[in-house]
Amino acid sequence: MKQKNRKYDQYTHHFLSIMYKLFKENPEIFKIKKLRGIHGICDYENDEIQIDYRKYLIPTIIHEVMHYYYPDWSETKILIEERKIINYLSVRQIKHIIKRFANIL
């Protein structure tokens, strides 16, 4: 059985804490929409994170929250970090993200 990397465990936990804080303190910024050609967008001007519900929901939420918190990161860096988190999440953590996100809609 593959052992978990403690560094990624701490990193994932830290990011989830940031994301849950955003869910709790600013739930109104999340909008569910049909978007054309994209899965989601972090709209800084209108302080919105738009998510297309027809696409990959969990990775898109993580990706757009990263854009929200790290606006100076390149798209490439966001994609790399998103993949690290997605690949490291447990089933329990995925369920928790879904529950918390559903509660803000």
Language-model segment annotations:
Residues 38-41, 101-105:
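Short, functionally important secondary-structure microenvironments
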Residues 61:
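A conserved beta-strand element that flanks and buttresses the S-adenosyl-L-methionine
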Residues 64:
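Walker B catalytic acidic pair
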